[in-house]
């Protein structure tokens, strides 16, 4: 006979919080949309975010592309700018078409890698994205990144020193290689376990998938 075991608080400690991996590049305009809404959406569903900054450039180069496909294909690029403006209006985030696209993003990505498990990661990513896609300001200089870290009350000099260390530079290279191994071909990309979801328009599907994997906190006992 199958019967429920009486609730015990220890079950909650044994049930892992569902996780969504969020692979992004600050140069990616569609990653901007996801960065600006993922934390609130994940919180509503009690889903943890695994922040995975990586470089899109080497991914594109592996396909023989010298630039973003949006820049290599004029019709696609023209459509993309219209689509981004509509999507920003829909979710209520500011938008200014950047004068340089795609922008350099290595330095803020290195900082994001340092902060990936820190409570400030979401706020930092939002500030960098807003700087790029709402304010049309450079994001890839120590001065720019320091300004955003300082605005968050963080020790900018110490964080930048760690971000620029040889060890952290290698970590970003390894993370970008890991993206290639996982089959990532663009950003944003989300993983729930081995299930991949590509594009900002699949964020909600990825979050729903993660939430559905939440284990039953009142497991059945067979006996």
Predicted regions and their residues:
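Extreme N-terminal basic, low-complexity initiation segments
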Residues: 2-5
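C-terminal cap of thioredoxin/glutaredoxin-like
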Residues: 7, 11-21, 25-47, 127-223
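Structural alpha/beta surface segment adjacent to cysteine/selenocysteine redox centers
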Residues: 32-132, 209, 220
């Amino acid at each position: 006979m199958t019967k429920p075991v009486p609730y015990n608080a220890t079950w909650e400690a044994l049930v892992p919080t569902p996780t969504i991996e969020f692979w992004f590049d600050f140069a990616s305009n569609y990653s901007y949309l996801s960065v600006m809404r993922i934390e609130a959406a994940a919180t509503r569903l009690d889903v943890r975010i695994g922040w995975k900054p990586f470089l899109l450039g080497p991914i594109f180069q592996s396909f023989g592309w010298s630039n973003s496909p949006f820049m290599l294909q004029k019709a696609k690029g023209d459509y993309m700018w219209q689509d981004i403006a509509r999507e920003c209006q829909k979710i209520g985030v500011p938008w200014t078409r950047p004068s340089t696209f795609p922008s350099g993003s290595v330095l803020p990505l290195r900082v994001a890698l340092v902060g990936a498990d820190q409570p400030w990661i979401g706020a930092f990513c939002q500030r960098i994205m807003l700087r790029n896609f709402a304010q049309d300001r450079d994001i890839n200089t120590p001065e720019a990144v320091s300004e955003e870290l300082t605005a968050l009350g963080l020790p900018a000099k110490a964080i930048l020193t760690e971000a620029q260390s040889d060890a952290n530079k290698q970590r970003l290279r390894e993370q970008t290689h890991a993206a290639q191994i996982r089959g990532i071909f663009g950003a944003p990309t989300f993983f729930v376990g081995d299930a991949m979801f590509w594009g900002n328009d699949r964020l909600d599907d990825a979050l729903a998938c993660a939430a559905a994997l939440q284990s039953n906190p009142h497991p059945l006992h067979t006996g």
